[in-house]
């Protein structure tokens, strides 16, 4: 079983160019994190502990003890935290465009992240209003119009209040300490042109995870599975099969 976890501006449809490929060989599942896509909103704060239990219930629903967990950006954060809580449920980890925790990003990137996403929404804008600018800051090659349009659509569909709560929780949640504990095969993938979580950050993560490999995907930014799906699929299937 393979489970795909989207990022902070995404939903399960972000994996539409990947699921059919992996479904040929694996039970393949993509979810909407609580407060995203078709999942319901919730009362109170966004709490990762609740999300980890949600993910465990996905395995239980399909009657699986273990799964290959693939997470992009915040999805990588969830995957890492899930490993800490449920290590025996993880066959392999794939961490895509992943970080140490948003608060550990470059200070200018953190400021840009908050200014472009949180502040406009608090000042009355809707996700669709910020979608074009945010998408252009994440995409590696603006000539890749299909990827850009998919990303704009994804951001436009965000649940505003849930998104704001998720930003707050992600900003204050650290998970770097977990990397040294990971004891399953781990693939790290990152876009060559990713400015939010650059290759240098993924190389640092690789140093901390034993039995890990890294692949830098050319001509891609922060959404490698959307920007370069064929390259992404080929490298991930090679990892999962070997």
Annotate each PLM feature:
Residues 182, 188-190, 194:
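Short beta-strand/loop motif that positions the catalytic acidic residue
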Residues 80-85, 91-123:
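Flexible "cap/lid" loop of the alpha/beta hydrolase fold
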Residues 50-67:
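Conserved acidic catalytic loop of the alpha/beta-hydrolase fold
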Residues 71, 75, 79:
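Gly/Ala-rich beta-loop-alpha elbow adjacent to hydrolase catalytic centers
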Residues 1-44:
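Conserved HGGG/HGGXW glycine-rich cap/lid loop of the alpha/beta-hydrolase fold
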Residues 199, 203-223:
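Catalytic histidine neighborhood in serine/cysteine hydrolases
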Residues 220-229, 233:
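Catalytic histidine-centered segment of alpha/beta-hydrolase-like enzymes
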Residues 105-111, 124-180:
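Conserved alpha/beta-hydrolase catalytic His-Asp/Glu region
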């Amino acid at each position: 079983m393979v489970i795909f976890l989207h990022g902070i501006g995404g939903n399960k449809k972000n994996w539409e160019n990947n699921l059919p490929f992996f479904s040929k060989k694996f039970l393949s599942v993509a979810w909407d994190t609580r407060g995203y896509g078709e999942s319901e909103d919730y009362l109170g704060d966004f709490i990762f502990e609740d999300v980890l239990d949600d993910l465990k219930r996905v395995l239980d629903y399909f009657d699986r003890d273990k799964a290959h967990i693939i997470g992009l950006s915040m999805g990588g954060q969830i995957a890492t935290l899930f490993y800490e809580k449920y290590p025996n449920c993880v066959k392999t980890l794939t961490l895509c465009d992943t970080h140490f925790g948003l608060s550990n990003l470059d200070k200018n990137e953190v400021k840009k992240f908050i200014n472009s996403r949180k502040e406009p929404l608090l000042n009355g804008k809707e996700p669709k209003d910020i979608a074009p600018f945010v998408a252009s800051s994440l995409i590696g090659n603006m000539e890749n119009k299909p990827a850009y349009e998919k990303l704009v659509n994804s951001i436009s569909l965000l649940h505003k209040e849930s998104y704001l709560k998720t930003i707050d929780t992600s900003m204050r949640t650290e998970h770097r300490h977990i990397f040294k504990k990971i004891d399953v095969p781990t693939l790290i993938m990152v876009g060559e042109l990713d400015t939010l979580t650059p290759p240098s950050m993924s190389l640092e993560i690789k140093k901390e995870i034993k039995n890990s490999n890294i692949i830098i995907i050319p001509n891609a930014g922060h959404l490698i599975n959307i920007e370069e799906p064929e390259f992404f699929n080929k490298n991930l299937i090679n990892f999962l099969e070997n």
